Amino acid sequence: MQHAPEPGESQSEDSDDSVSDNDDDEEDAQPTSNAYAALLQSLSTVAKQNEHQETHRRKKRKLAGEDLQVAEEPQQKINRNMSNLTEDEPDAVFDGDALDEDPQEDAASDDGVQIRDAVEETQDGFESFEVHFANPDENDLAMRLRRISENQWSAKKLHAAGGRALLQVPCADNTAFDTRKLRSTRDVQLKARLAENAQKVVGQFNDGHEQVIMPSIFGYQDVLFAARTVHNAARMRDITCLHALNHILIGRDRVLKNNAKLAAANDGDDVEYRDQGFTRPKVLFLLETKQACVRVVDSITRLFTFEQQENKKRFLDQFHRPDQAFSDDKPADFRELFEGNDENEFRVGVKLTRKTLKFYSTFYNSDIIFASPLGLRRAIETGDPKKRSGDYDFLSSIEMVIMEQADANLMQNWEHAEFVFEHLNLQPKESHGCDFSRVRPWYLDDNAKHVRQTIVMSAFLTPKINTLWNKHMRNFFGRLKYTPDYSAGVIESLSHGIKGIKQTFWRFESPSHLTDPDARFKYFSSTILPSILRTPKPAEGGPGILMFVPSYLDFTRLRNSLVDVNISYALISEYTDMTDVRKARSHFMNGKHSLLLYSGRAHHFHRFNIRGVKRVVFYGVPENPIFYEELVSMVGKSVERGETSRAEASIRVMFSKWERMELERIVGTKRLSRMVGDKGDVFDFVY
């Protein structure tokens, strides 16, 4: 089981990925802005070095007051765009052998039938793609981008069974909130090659959250879905994979169709098609474990029937581990996250042709990139020793990001996720064989980050995920946030002998979020710790006080402060050796240690069922409400075993006004305002 490394810690593994090669792409644009001129000038030297020295047909265009000579032999351009395999000089290859690819094989697989499909399926059949990516209205786009820069969002609450949905659009026109109801995949504009399998795999959309969020997902709005569960995870995975595949196929077929038109054009025809980006990769899946990657690939292969899957065995050998399973006494969410291959440093590129799914394609030659935030950061930072700042050009044209388990990534190092988002859709440093005459204008104007669709799924919402929403989910089409209904809170559904045990919530004053750790420690030292020291030791066993500390920084601070306190205690953190863990649990259970300091990440990675717990003190409210249930149930089990009485057992929770989201999930929405805003600072619950 992999723990999150500290910023300087390494967790390398077998070669499982590939990162770079010069590549061509499938997105378009006409250079009509100063930004384009500046970008082209900065890259012209590199571009000229990569061009073949052959006789070219020349076409002249007017660009920002200058004549730009674009020299390309038509058939060479067509082959390059269809196969995206002009690998002039590999920039870097990460972790093992990137596989050689044959341009002729690729062109043959895509050429005939796929061009016919592209011609048969009219571009007008995919309205969302057309107005969002292909031909957005310039005036409307400019207006929306201006409102985004001023943080002006019009908002509307949507009716959502079992949850709350907020739709925001950077537009004052109320018609922007109008959406088409989607009852099943038949109501979604899908490529013909996906429609039948989509109906079999996904079919009808349910009347709960799916009816609310599907128009935003398939309408290319950003979506923050903070209601992911073990039960709906597979379904949400199938839906997002369907959307990603559809997006790739629409864009690819459009490029092939335009290639055919260019090939048929006469020398004097002034034709241009803006249908590409700077580089080929279009979809980025940010996943937590290798096993999660296997599940996504499985979903993709059920939705699209490939005649061949190249290097699939190698992929399964490195990513799939069916023999690693846990017993049923571990909770379902833990098993879903950690069963199978739970390694959390990986990245792998995948390329789609009409008949073949190719694993381990170089990043610049891939349509989809699967990666963990840690693995992708490692690739960017260490990929090419010649580039001191790292290579991230392969992320310049990402049009869709799907982050499947943001809550799990919080328990790793969230800085890795922030790092990845900071490096998305930046202007490339090199040309990578790009045909600038076909790059879309909003790429050249550095607006790709506002056109990109970002879909983030999480079991719950946190301030860090909210920051991601505010900073990186700024789609010009709008954004939707969906959260579950917490009207009751988990406190009303506790079991395992909790009935009759007092649960006390202590609010302390915290004037600033930045100084909250200091205020929390001061309150603990002056109020909570003295009461712990006064706890009488029973005739048999010990007081059984477990202190749960969500933050590792707080854990370290408490550990250091207890050195000078007259109390016997044990420590369990995510970095504690398993031998020491067993010793700490044993001494705590038999009463040798009165206090057990227990970190939030230790519980996340191991979900220990600790014996001898008679009292729990929460140094902070756990972000995951399941943790609260599990820790409180340890007290209930001690009561059921007769190790303590209901009168002696207790639950105490420290909280401040900065923990509203965490507190709401525990006590429920109806109690939240009173507990945060009332004059009183102690709140007792007994069920």
Curated annotation (Swiss-Prot):
Compartments, record wording: Nucleus, Nucleolus
GO BP field: maturation of SSU-rRNA from tricistronic rRNA transcript (SSU-rRNA, 5.8S rRNA, LSU-rRNA)
Cellular component annotations (GO), alphabetically ordered: nucleolus; small-subunit processome
UniProt keywords, alphabetically: Nucleus, Ribonucleoprotein, Ribosome biogenesis, rRNA processing
First-listed, main subcellular location of the protein, grouped into a coarse class: nucleus
Region span, Disordered: 1-111
Composition bias, Acidic residues: 11-29, 86-109
Pfam families referenced in this protein's UniProt entry, alphabetically: Utp25_C, UTP25_NTPase-like
Transmembrane feature ranges: none
An MF annotation (GO) of this entry: rRNA binding
SUPFAM superfamilies xrefs: P-loop containing nucleoside triphosphate hydrolases (SSF52540)
Function: DEAD-box RNA helicase-like protein required for pre-18S rRNA processing, specifically at sites A0, A1, and A2.
Subunit structure: Component of the ribosomal small subunit (SSU) processome composed of at least 40 protein subunits and snoRNA U3.
Protein family (similarity comment): Belongs to the UTP25 family.
Protein name listed in UniProt: U3 small nucleolar RNA-associated protein 25
Organism: Phaeosphaeria nodorum (strain SN15 / ATCC MYA-4574 / FGSC 10173)
Organism lineage string: Eukaryota, Fungi, Dikarya, Ascomycota, Pezizomycotina
Originating gene: UTP25
